[in-house]
A protein has these predicted regions:
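N-terminal chloroplast transit peptides
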Residues: 1-20
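Non-catalytic interaction-recognition regions
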Residues: 20-21, 26-155, 162-166, 172-642
């Protein structure tokens, strides 16, 4: 058993305190959603509870799955079957249940009633609990159960969302405590474009999981420990002997300070020896070295926070130093379980299928990333009680995480193979940011692109385009300087984020300001302007939307109204898919499709001045509400006027 170390770490204000998280309220799923076997009557009761719960209904897919689960348990009580419900193309209906073929293959020759997949599908339909959400069902082909949703129910669902809030459309996820490890820059180094993907992908995953009612720990595992600090501290002492008196002026530009110390470390063997001695003295806890380390960490943290503030990202720092005191106990536990072996002077864990072992103690007796990561995982599982731990890094670290997770499974910390079992870990890998030349994105002088400079340029370009648009339309006088600044930031930073998030994270993508700031196509600019246009439609109607919510009624009478309504109510399942598969681009695709479907609706259905004005204004408002929630989940500020 690993106890809490007497000294948790050499603490610093940059690494903050070491609070133990209290166990938050868990979100309990109905048993039908958790996989526990229910009698048909109980399953039907669970379905009714989900559908009628005024606070949280889950996705349409989840609600339909509960109905079909009840039917499958009633029709085939001897089989343990999970319903396979998915959205389908319009010519077949709105959704499909695709269990029949699989069930029939299990029942071949064992049932006189179910002679073919089609009869299985008909049996499933016959035992469906009654529900207002389903208008029609039919069996097609080899047993596919086609489902048509009730337009009246769809309209009521949208109206309920407008009355009770978008939170009622949050999906139901099985994990209740999730830790997302993302961003994680190194102390004393400036954040660059390479940190962009981890920061915004991790932030979006955290936002989606929080919306889905998980308790989320946003963890910044900064590199605040290791040999580089001996180099930095020794350079500080030798260059500015009076560093304590002159304060931060001694360090100045932290990036330049790092480069200068690294140059000495690489070129001066005597300095290198002194730097290595400084590491030993720091790790032994000498006050002078600890104070210098604190000072460097504090300066770095403030610079990081300026970037996070601009990106709207919130993180809690628990750096490498926090977990350092836990490493000996964790390694002792792993050794007692027979996992750690000696190999060529190092202590290692051999992983099945891997030629190279996972090194946990180096030849010189020092710790490394693997030993720190194992200690961090132990802490996160045993102290913070996380159900799901997600690591957001580049794909180049995939092998490390494969081996690291395998070691944790061998230790019995994680389930061996069942991907649905908890606790679990996931590595969210992502590709490179490329320049126009197809190579890693760098400045003309081959330096990495500083994230601060990139954000500055995004805002400045956005502001220039906005000013040009307003001057051409004659609306510039209607805007205050503050509105211009905030809108330029929203569009500029949003464009940078969306250009990244709309891509499958595993792929590389080419960074182009011209493309991401284009107001046509699948860009943040286009989507933000689309949202602003919807807000303008509502304003120009002269109607108070809050009054309409109380007295009006949505009717999905026109084909394009129904298409838009159907896409709106699929919001929750798209968030669910994005969370489950850890793919933010799923939400981006949904948002872009929503804008497209609204455009078609607006082109074919007159809103202001029509007989259906109230209903259609409410549909406009529902679209704007869902778009705003999508923007929020993607970390993008909405724009209300253009």
């Amino acid at each position: 058993m690993i106890g809490t170390p007497a000294v948790l770490s050499i603490s610093s204000s940059s690494c903050r305190s070491h609070p133990l998280f209290s166990s938050g309220k868990r979100t309990l799923l109905p048993r039908a959603m958790s996989g526990e076997t229910l009698a048909p009557a109980a399953a039907a009761a669970v379905q009714e509870q989900i559908v009628q719960d005024g606070n949280r209904v889950g996705s349409v897919k989840q609600q339909l799955s509960s109905l079909f689960e009840a039917s499958l348990r009633a029709t085939f009580p001897e089989l343990n079957i999970e319903p396979m419900v998915a959205a389908c193309t319009a010519k077949f209906g709105d959704y499909q249940c695709n269990n029949a073929m699989g069930i029939w293959s299990k029942l071949k020759g064992a049932s006189a009633e179910f002679k073919n997949p089609k009869s299985v599908g008909q049996g499933i339909i016959s035992n469906l609990p009654p529900s207002e959400m389903i208008e029609s069902t039919s069996v097609a082909g080899p047993g596919f159960v086609n489902i048509g949703l009730s337009s009246t129910w769809m309209a009521q669902s949208i109206q309920n969302m407008l009355s009770n809030g978008i939170g009622t459309w949050a999906p139901l996820l099985p994990a209740s405590r999730v830790l997302v490890d993302f961003s994680s820059p190194n102390i004393a180094k400036e954040m660059h474009v390479g940190h962009l993907r981890s920061t915004i992908i991790g932030d979006t995953l955290a936002r989606m999981l929080e919306f889905s009612n998980a308790e989320v720990f946003r963890r910044n595992h900064v590199g605040d420990w290791g040999t580089q600090f001996g180099m930095l501290i020794q350079h500080l002492f030798e260059t500015f002997p009076n560093w304590e008196d002159i304060g931060e002026q001694a360090i100045g530009d932290l990036q330049e300070f790092y480069k200068a110390s690294k140059k000495r470390f690489d070129e001066d063997d005597l300095f290198k020896e002194r730097a290595q001695e400084a590491v030993v003295r720091l790790q032994s806890g000498e006050d002078k070295y600890r104070d210098a380390w604190k000072r460097i960490c504090e300066i770095s943290r403030r610079e990081f926070d300026l970037v996070y503030e601009r990106l709207g990202v919130h993180l809690e720092v628990k750096g490498e130093s926090f977990y350092n005191p836990y490493i000996p106990g964790v390694l002792e536990e792993l050794s007692s379980k027979g996992l750690i072996e000696e190999s060529e002077g190092a202590r290692v864990i051999f992983i099945e299928g891997q030629q190279i072992p996972l090194i946990v103690v180096k030849r010189d007796g020092g710790y490394n990333y693997a030993s720190t990561d194992l200690a961090a995982l132990w802490y996160r599982l045993n102290v913070e009680k996380a159900d799901w731990i997600i690591y957001v890094t580049d794909v180049g670290q995939s092998l490390h995480f494969t081996m690291f997770f395998s070691a944790a499974k061998r230790a019995g910390w994680l389930p061996d193979s069942n991907i649905k079992a908890f606790p679990k870990t996931s590595h969210v890998g992502f590709g490179l940011v490329l320049g126009s030349d197809g190579k890693r994105f760098r400045t003309r002088s081959s330096e990495v692109v500083r994230l601060v400079e990139l954000l500055d340029e995004a805002k400045n370009r956005s502001k220039a385009e906005l000013l040009k648009r307003l001057e051409e339309s004659g609306k510039l006088a209607e805007w205050t300087d503050e509105e211009l600044e905030k809108t330029a930031e929203a569009i500029g930073y949003g464009a940078v984020k969306y250009a990244d998030l709309k891509n499958n994270r595993l792929t590389n993508y080419t960074f182009s300001f011209d493309q991401m700031l284009n107001d046509k196509g699948n860009t943040a600019v286009y989507l933000l302007y689309a949202h602003a246009r919807i807000c303008s439609i509502i304003r120009k109607s002269g109607k108070e939307i809050e009054d309409l919510k109380k007295t009006g009624r949505i009717v999905l009478g026109h084909a394009d109204e129904r298409i838009l309504g159907l896409h709106l109510i699929r919001f929750a399942e798209n968030v669910e898919e994005a969370c489950t598969n850890l793919l933010p681009n799923v939400l981006c695709e949904y948002l872009y499709d929503l804008s497209d479907k609204f455009s078609r609706f607006y082109a074919s259905c007159q809103v202001v001045g029509s007989a259906e004005e109230t209903s259609r204004l409410l549909l406009c408002e529902a679209t704007a509400v869902v778009m705003r929630k999508c923007f929020h989940l993607l970390g993008i500020q909405p724009v209300y006027k253009i």
